[in-house]
Amino acid sequence: MAGFVLKNTLSDNGGVTRGICKMNEDYNLTEVVETKNIVKTAAGAEAEGMAVDVDSLVSMNMWGLTPDFLTTLEEGFKEFFEKEVPGNPLKAEYLIPIFIGELLEHGKMSVKVLKTNDTWYGMTYHEDVAAVKDSFKRMLENGVYKTDLFSDL
């Protein structure tokens, strides 16, 4: 799983939800703590009035999973559908990070966190659009991406 540095995923325009990664010394994921309304501050970041380490690694749901995981996912979905959907058929959500967290908790899966210092270009707020467009324009100008990115498809 790609572990983004929190400060590289925050919006200048308001709070965001991020899955803060807890890991052992070998960067094996032990838990993802969903943290809501993380906002930039002069000192770094905070959520619900508590400081949050801006150098924490966070999950942006960029998982690298093996084909065998699809079988496990399907089995988990059947259980989810039987238990969760009847009580809340319109809003029940099968969230992969929560499912993976349960597998980690029961020792049925391991996930290596691979740190990336890249920036996450998210559009949580309408006001984020201009900054994202500007960032992609600069990447095109700097040759990070070619202008005709999809021409060979």
Q: Language-model features: where?
A:
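Hydrophobic alpha-helical scaffolding
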Residues: 63, 86-90, 122
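Residues that scaffold the ATP/ADP-binding catalytic core of kinase and kinase-like folds
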Residues: 32, 72-73, 132
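Conserved core of the sugar-phosphate nucleotidyltransferase
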Residues: 1-63, 67
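A C-terminal functional module that forms or caps the active site or interfaces directly
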Residues: 74-109
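Hydrophobic helical membrane-anchoring modules
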Residues: 107-110, 118-153
